[in-house]
Every structure is written in structure tokens, then in C-alpha cells.
């Protein structure tokens, strides 16, 4: 039996690589004669930079930048020559010929939800300013472009914080510049956006690797789907939604040449960061899952597997809209492979195309979240053991 173990992260508990290693070791313990391949699914969130840079033996750099709450954090990014990127991935990225070296930047390193305490999370006063600082450092280190993994974010600021650090300015109704990070809390004060001078050369290119395909606004938009996990309360949803639409229109009015639209697939990723970086800096949105798949040769591993084991911290409807575990699960079903999806918790999935018998929640249903997070490794080992000690 040939097994492919391909997990995404269990947020606040295990990285994708750790989850894969744990699951593979448990399967191997129960089925020592099986062939096991691992493929961590860093589709834009945690582990994105480490995975892509590490595969190519690229350079790693660190920089002290602003975290979501405007404290300092040491963030890591990678640098790789374009010629070293696998051909299938280069075709997806479609760089201009003058782009010779690119940075691989993980938004979660500077603006990730893991950098904020679970208690008291709120989208109103957190910023992506550190992401902009990280891009600036990477460019000074020799990057001609950047692949930005948009996932695992704490923010819903349309990447306006990043744009602020890269030259954009925000003004009140009297034309006065607002000299602080443009977090949603101060959005009502913003009447105009300007770009007196961009901190990046005009030749600098961005690719925005998203782990979801949600639009910016509406019932499937960034605030509606991902706001609650960032601390957005139901009574303030409409307030944030309305201001998101207004600020998006202001940004497009300033930098309309890049033709970003709120309905663009993936525009709602990372609190609208995909929209903001596309509108403000001409970034191109692409599937993080497809990019990583091409980068690490997942297609070959998948084609050889008889059984696919995948999962993440929360498996819900959004998992089936661009995230690695959901996409891989649908591909496994399509190809008639055996499938096991294991998640910390299972959310609502209307008309789920995956058989319920293939999905299992590793945590006991009534276990409080803090305790469940601490026991994630133990629960994953137990779930794998239960499944494969009894399977045919």
C-alpha cells in the first residue's frame, strides 16, 4: 500500500510539516510494510516560506518588523534565483525576463494570527505594516520580485498597512495626513488615499499565493467567512463590511491602473490583503495550493498513492474553496483513491462532496479549545492509530 500524508497546519498547535511527520510515523508504526510519502501543504499560510525556500536550498534572511499589534517581531523570508524554481512553478508565476531573484515571504511571519493571543483577538486594531517592511527589506537584499503567501493572517486591513510602509499615504477630510497605521479602527477618518512616492522600483513584481478563492465582499467575503476567527463579532460585521467597501473604492480611485475588483477570485484572502496588494502594487493572485503542488512535485506523489491522508486544524466549507486539504480531497475522490481527512474540528459543510466516513474529528467534541490545542499531537496520534490499526 502506498500512502501520501499531506497535512496543512493545525493553527496554534502544529505546523504542516510537524503534522505530516507525526501522522507518517504513526502509520509506519502500525503498517511497517507500507510505503509512505509526506508532502506538507503550505498553501500560502504558515510554513510557506520555509517549504518553498528549503526545497531549493535557498537563502534565509531575518528582519525585525512590526507585528499585528505594532510590537517588534523577528520575521524570516527566503531568497531564491528564478532559474532554480521548477519549470512547472515558473510557468505559473510567469515572471518578466528581468526578474532574476525573488523573495518568498510568508505574511504570517509578520502579520500572523499566531502572533496575537487567542483571548481578545480583534480585527479593528491590527495591521499588515510589518509585511510592507519585510517586502522593503527583501528588495534591498536583492529581490527583483516577491512571492507572498497570504494565509494565517490576524488582519482585515486590505494590506493598507503594508501599502503605508511602501509609500501610500492616508488623509482625513481636511487633507491632513494620518500618521499612524491605517487599521480598521481609524478607517472612518480616512477620506483620501495618495501615493506621492512608491518605495519599490516600478520593475518589482508580486505574486500573491492565496489559500482561498473568496471574494472581498458579501456572504462569502473575507469579513463574513474569516472575520469571526479574527475576533469580529456579529453585531459589528456590517460596519466592517461597509468600511471595507468604501476603502477599497478609495484605493482603486488612487491606483486604478491595476484593475483590481472586489469580486476577483481570492480578493478576500488574508483580510483583503490580496485585493489591496493587487490594486495598490499590481500583484497577481494565484492559487497557493497549485503553486506549492508544482514546486514540490505533489502530482507525482499523488499519482503513485493508493491512500491519501490529509487534514488541518479546522476543516469546513472554506476548505473546499482553494485550501490544500480540501482540494486534495476532491482530487482523491475524483481519482478513486482511498481518503482519510483528519481535522482538529469539523465545521459546517453544506452538501459536502466528501463521504462522511472519510472525515474524522481528532478532538473530543466537548473538549475546550485551549485544552484541545495542547493535546493536538496526542489526539492526532490516537486518531491515526485507531484508523490504521483496524484498517484493511
Where do the language-model regions lie?
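N-terminal loops that bind phosphate or other acidic moieties
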Residues: 1-150, 154-392
Amino acid at each position: 500500500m502506498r500512502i501520501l500524508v499531506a497535512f496543512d497546519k493545525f493553527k496554534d498547535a502544529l505546523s504542516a510539516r510537524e503534522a505530516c511527520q507525526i501522522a507518517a510515523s504513526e502509520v509506519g508504526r502500525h503498517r511497517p510494510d507500507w510505503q509512505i510519502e509526506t508532502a506538507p501543504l503550505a498553501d500560502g499560510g504558515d510554513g510557506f516560506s520555509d517549504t518553498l525556500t528549503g526545497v531549493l536550498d535557498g537563502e534565509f534572511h531575518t528582519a525585525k518588523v512590526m507585528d499585528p499589534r505594532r510590537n517588534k517581531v523577528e520575521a524570516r523570508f527566503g531568497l531564491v534565483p528564478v532559474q532554480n524554481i521548477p519549470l512547472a512553478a515558473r510557468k505559473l508565476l510567469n515572471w518578466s525576463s528581468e526578474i532574476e531573484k525573488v523573495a518568498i515571504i510568508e505574511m504570517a511571519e509578520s502579520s500572523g494570527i499566531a502572533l496575537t493571543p487567542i483571548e481578545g483577538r480583534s480585527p479593528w486594531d491590527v495591521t499588515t505594516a510589518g509585511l510592507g517592511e519585510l517586502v522593503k527589506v527583501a528588495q534591498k537584499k536583492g529581490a527583483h520580485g516577491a512571492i507572498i503567501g497570504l494565509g494565517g493572517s490576524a488582519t482585515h486591513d486590505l494590506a493598507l498597512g503594508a501599502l503605508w510602509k511602501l509609500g501610500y499615504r492616508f488623509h482625513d477630510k481636511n487633507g491632513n495626513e494620518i500618521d499612524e497605521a491605517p487599521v480598521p479602527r481609524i478607517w472612518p477618518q480616512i477620506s483620501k488615499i495618495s501615493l506621492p512616492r512608491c518605495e519599490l522600483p516600478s520593475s518589482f513584481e508580486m505574486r500573491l499565493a492565496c489559500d482561498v478563492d473568496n471574494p472581498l465582499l458579501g456572504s462569502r467575503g473575507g469579513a463574513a467567512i474569516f472575520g469571526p476567527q479574527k475576533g469580529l463579532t456579529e453585531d459589528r460585521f456590517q460596519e466592517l463590511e461597509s468600511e471595507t467597501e468604501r476603502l477599497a473604492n478609495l484605493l482603486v480611485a488612487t491606483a486604478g491602473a491595476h484593475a483590481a475588483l472586489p469580486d476577483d477570485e481570492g480578493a478576500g484572502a488574508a483580510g483583503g490583503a490580496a485585493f489591496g496588494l493587487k490594486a495598490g502594487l499590481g500583484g497577481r493572485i494565484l492559487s497557493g495550493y497549485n503553486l506549492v503542488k508544482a514546486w514540490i512535485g505533489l502530482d507525482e506523489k499523488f499519482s503513485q498513492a493508493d491512500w491519501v491522508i490529509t487534514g488541518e486544524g479546522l476543516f469546513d466549507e472554506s476548505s473546499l474553496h482553494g485550501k490544500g486539504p480540501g482540494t486534495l480531497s476532491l482530487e482523491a475522490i475524483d481519482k478513486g483513491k482511498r481518503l482519510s481527512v483528519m481535522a482538529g474540528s469539523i465545521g459546517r459543510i453544506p452538501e459536502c462532496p466528501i463521504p462522511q466516513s472519510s472525515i474524522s474529528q481528532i478532538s473530543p467534541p466537548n473538549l475546550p479549545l485551549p485544552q484541545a490545542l495542547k493535546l493536538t499531537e496526542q489526539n492526532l496520534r490516537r486518531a491515526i492509530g485507531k484508523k490504521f490499526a483496524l484498517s484493511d
